[in-house]
From Swiss-Prot:
Belongs to the universal ribosomal protein uS7 family. Part of the 30S ribosomal subunit. Contacts proteins S9 and S11. It comes from the Bacteria. Keywords: Ribonucleoprotein, Ribosomal protein, RNA-binding, rRNA-binding, tRNA-binding. NCBIfam families: rpsG_bact. The keyword Endoplasmic reticulum does not apply. GO terms for cellular component: cytosolic small ribosomal subunit; ribosome. This is Small ribosomal subunit protein uS7. GO terms for biological process: ribosomal small subunit assembly; translation. It comes from Pseudomonas aeruginosa (strain ATCC 15692 / DSM 22644 / CIP 104116 / JCM 14847 / LMG 12228 / 1C / PRS 101 / PAO1).
Length: 156
């Protein structure tokens, strides 16, 4: 346990176009090497593509996609008497969002479309419909937790 005080959580400023804190945080996940303007261009470009493809509100689609990706439970390794058990634990809301954003960006980067904006738009639309690689990752994590339910009494 740390001896110092716990660092205060900094508030993220809402993004200028949509006024959403979650979107601003997502831009920080997309950003590489401190290039925020590039990250903004990618995210706004992706949301414009989502709007083009007939979805009414791109921000609503984005939030729906995040909900579809965010895991409810995950497994943590716990060592008990020489054996390591995968113990299912509930995921904190802040970690849920962080994992969802991380998975969304990671799997968007692995897609085959030309630009990152197109890849991100494709992954967002897939996730909002309950399919795509990021949603599959969530299902895998849930399946792992379900398989190790027997060890849930080894709480943290």
């Amino acid at each position: 346990m740390p001896r110092r005080r716990v660092a205060a959580k900094r508030e993220v400023l809402a993004d200028p176009k949509y006024g959403s804190q979650i979107l601003a945080k997502f831009m920080n996940h997309v950003m590489e090497s401190g290039k925020k303007a590039v990250a903004e261009r990618i995210v706004y470009g992706a949301l414009d593509k989502v709007k083009e493809r007939g979805k009414a509100d791109p921000l609503e689609t984005f939030e729906k996609a995040l909900d579809a990706i965010a895991p409810l439970v995950e497994v943590k390794s716990r060592r008990v008497g020489g054996a390591t058990y995968q113990v299912p634990v509930e995921v904190r809301p802040s970690r849920r969002n962080a994992l969802a954003m991380r998975w969304l960006v990671d799997f968007a980067r692995k897609r085959g479309e030309k630009s990152m904006a197109l890849r991100l738009a494709g992954e967002l639309l897939d996730a909002a419909e309950g399919k795509g690689a990021a949603v599959k990752k969530r299902e895998d994590v849930h399946r792992m937790a379900e398989a190790n339910k027997a060890f849930s009494h080894y709480r943290f």
